[in-house]
A protein has these predicted regions:
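Donor nucleotide-activated moiety binding/catalytic core segment of transferases
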Residues: 71-80, 207-236, 240, 251
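Catalytic donor nucleotide-activated moiety binding site of glycosyltransferases and closely related
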Residues: 34-35, 44-49, 53-60, 175-178, ...
């Protein structure tokens, strides 16, 4: 069975990697969004992601987004002509461009991605058990089979790692700021004071500026004492790995609520407030007090859904 894998964001490449290693075949095609971090991951994917025919499509944002969307639709329609299964994470265009008889799987954990939800045309929708249905508009009213997975996307591709047994002096902190041009970034991005970085050893992983190997970002995170970021994806992955994450964002996600409820080390500030910052700094030194949290087998759950 020929499969189309839609990689619209670097996190999608990480999610797909263990799935492709299990079920991809040489007839598959990767539809990859032409953005710096996605291109970096595809070009340096040896040993991580199977090499497949890759078709590059534009990212439909900015002033000419409708023209870019149409161009992307045409490119994808041609590339997916003989594809039987299309798998997309929050990217709707390829689900419309896919053959009518194909199975079209739409994976999402982002409730407020309403534009993508609206234009997606799936046969199957895959959401996490903590997905806040009421925030997702009419997504779950579509004529599609609804599947629910028990954990976060990060549980599918991350692995528990050894952590430093003491905090560095100064603390080693990975920082990731976003450009803020994403389809649902408006209203979510919150700036934080430069003074918050004083006295910290900062590793720069800002969007489009990370210079280390893109597939080893999780190793970099695990080797740090903490993370400070505007990215909900990076914050959630750090928390899953047991690294105290300070997320400065107005974003509302079911998985953020889940992480807090389950006791993961994530600190969320939607106003860059000093109290949350102070709590995070204190949390850097409390790793010994973290309880062991169950690791859901999301990879197996996704493989079962995609194969049946």
């Amino acid at each position: 069975m020929a499969i189309g894998w839609v990689i619209d964001h670097p996190a999608h490449a990480r999610l797909f990697a263990p799935l492709m290693r299990e079920m991809s075949n040489p007839n598959d095609v990767i539809i990859a969004c032409d953005r710096i971090e996605v291109r970096s991951m595809i070009e340096q994917s040896d040993g991580f992601l199977p090499r497949r025919k890759t078709v590059w499509v534009p990212r439909p944002i900015g002033k000419n987004r409708f023209r870019k969307a149409l161009k992307r639709y045409r490119i994808s329609r041609k590339a997916l002509k003989n594809i039987e299964l299309v798998i997309s994470v929050g990217a709707p265009i390829e689900l419309r461009a896919a053959p009518k008889k194909s199975r079209r799987v739409y994976i999402t954990d982002t409730e407020i991605n309403h534009i993508a939800h609206k234009y997606s045309k799936p046969t199957d929708i895959v959401i996490p058990s903590h997905f806040e249905d009421k925030l997702s508009g009419n997504l779950l009213q579509k004529k599609a089979v609804i599947h629910r997975i028990s954990g976060l996307h990060g549980h599918a591709h991350l692995q528990p790692r050894m952590r430093p047994n003491q905090v560095s002096n100064p603390p080693k902190i990975l920082m990731r700021k976003l450009i803020g041009d994403g389809i649902h970034d408006d209203g979510e991005i919150v700036e934080f004071p430069d003074a918050w970085l004083n006295g910290l050893n900062i590793i720069n992983a800002n969007e489009n500026q990370y210079s280390a190997h893109p597939w080893k970002l999780d190793e970099e995170i695990s080797n740090c004492d903490g993370v400070i970021t505007q990215s909900v994806t990076l914050a959630s992955e750090a928390a899953i790995l047991g690294v105290p994450a300070l997320l400065i964002s107005n974003a509302k996600r079911g998985f953020l609520t889940r992480l807090q409820k389950d006791g993961y080390p994530i600190f969320i500030s939607n106003q860059a407030d000093e109290s949350t910052y102070a709590a995070w700094l204190a949390g850097l030194h409390l790793l010994d007090e973290l309880d062991s949290i169950e690791w859901p087998d999301v990879k197996s759950e996704l493989l079962y859904i995609l194969k049946h």
